[in-house]
């Protein structure tokens, strides 16, 4: 379901166009009438109008479990969600999430917690769960050249929690990391796997894609 389109290249996003509410709602309708959809994920929900139409039209009966990838801010600082829409996102989208997968910066924005320590990241995950997300993955940052691993914190619906750790790869080829991670989780849930298996497989696949980069573009290229 197309909610927005962007113009950009490896240097960054230059502009975006949000789809009309009626067009988004129509896509929900026609897809649910024809396909047996086993899982879904969100992407860029740019403003109040888009958030409302997605929340009004999504249902687990027609679209399966929902992976919420809160596309709020890119790794390079570009804002993709209007500031005025943060509270509505918390109220209407997060409670729909079977899994929510914010990156380090998005989790800071959604929770107001700095997360300078592991304990604060755990606190932020519980905060998001308190907002209604069943399972939470807070992805680690990739901006410290001294780091040796990238550590994601996972908090499951049953209270179980663990860290997913992979070696840090110093590279500018990271575009699509979060999109791919959430898409793989959705695909694994669609196959009937549980959340723990889904997030672990997603972490493994994204690490392999980062560790074997493609030389595409002149700046911040995509993962493989």
Short names for language-model regions:
Residues 1-79:
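Conserved N-terminal subdomain of the carbohydrate kinase-like
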């Amino acid at each position: 379901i197309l909610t927005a389109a962007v113009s950009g290249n490896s240097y960054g996003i230059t502009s975006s166009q949000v789809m009309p509410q009626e067009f988004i709602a129509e896509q929900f309708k026609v897809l649910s009438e024809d396909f047996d959809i086993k899982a879904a994920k969100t992407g860029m929900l740019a403003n109040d109008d888009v958030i409302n139409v997605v929340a009004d039209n999504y249902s687990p009966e027609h679209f399966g479990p929902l992976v919420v990838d809160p596309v709020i801010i890119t790794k390079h600082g570009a804002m993709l969600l209007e500031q005025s829409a943060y509270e509505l996102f918390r109220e209407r989208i997060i409670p729909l999430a079977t899994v929510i997968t914010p990156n380090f910066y998005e989790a800071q924005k959604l929770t107001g917690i700095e997360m300078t320590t592991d304990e604060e990241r755990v606190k932020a995950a519980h905060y998001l769960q308190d907002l209604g997300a069943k399972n939470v993955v807070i992805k680690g940052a990739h901006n410290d050249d001294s780091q040796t691993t990238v550590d994601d914190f996972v908090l499951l619906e049953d209270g179980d929690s663990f860290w997913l750790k992979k070696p840090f790869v110093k590279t500018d080829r990271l575009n699509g990391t979060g999109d791919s991670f959430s898409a793989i989780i959705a695909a694994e849930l669609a196959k009937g796997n549980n959340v723990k298996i889904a997030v672990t497989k997603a972490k493994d696949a994204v690490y392999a894609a980062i560790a074997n980069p493609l030389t595409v573009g002149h700046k911040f290229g995509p993962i493989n």
